[in-house]
Amino acid sequence: MQDAITSVINSSDVQGKYLDTAALEKLKGYFATGELRVRAATTISANAAAIVKEAVAKSLLYSDITRPGGNMYTTRRYAACIRDLDYYLRYSTYAMLAGDPSILDERVLNGLKETYNSLGVPVGATVQAIQAMKEVTASLVGPDAGKEMGVYFDYISSGLS
């Protein structure tokens, strides 16, 4: 896992040079949004279960996927879906705090699409639920933090699509 600081420093280090203006501006932007990120993470942490619950209600609960024969039918499959969505929310929050999506590749996306396909998990419905979670989260944390979190939800959605 990297953060925005490590990413900028490593890039300059590999090139054997001091931080240039563009690198310093990137760091300045990261630090300027630090308080916003921490407030958003605090709100998300305090409301994680409600965020997942509302996202499921908005995107999956009343669709064919939860009816007999659907991929979320049976309590075990439903619980696995909730667990996965909570996992995506948590790791998106980590990525938002770090200002870098690398943790999403390392801990979420590597091999996930293949695993879902082999288990018959509907990727489209998963992406729909992630997008619903993006909307619910933005409504709680406000437009600026919501936009920032949206980057990481979209990153996961794109990685699954």
From Swiss-Prot:
(2R,3E)-phycocyanobilin binds at residue 81. Its main location: membrane. The modification N4-methylasparagine is found at residue 71. It is a peripheral membrane protein. It holds the Pfam family Phycobilisome. It is found in: Cellular thylakoid membrane. This is Allophycocyanin beta chain. The keyword Electron transport applies. Belongs to the phycobiliprotein family. Heterodimer of an alpha and a beta chain. It comes from Anabaena cylindrica. InterPro entries: Allophycocyanin_b, Globin-like_sf, Phycobilisome_asu/bsu, Phycobilisome_asu/bsu_sf. Gene3D superfamilies: Phycocyanins. GO terms for cellular component: phycobilisome; plasma membrane-derived thylakoid membrane. PANTHER family: ALLOPHYCOCYANIN BETA CHAIN, PHYCOBILISOME 32.1 KDA LINKER POLYPEPTIDE, PHYCOCYANIN-ASSOCIATED, ROD 2-RELATED. Light-harvesting photosynthetic bile pigment-protein from the phycobiliprotein complex. Allophycocyanin has a maximum absorption at approximately 650 nanometers.
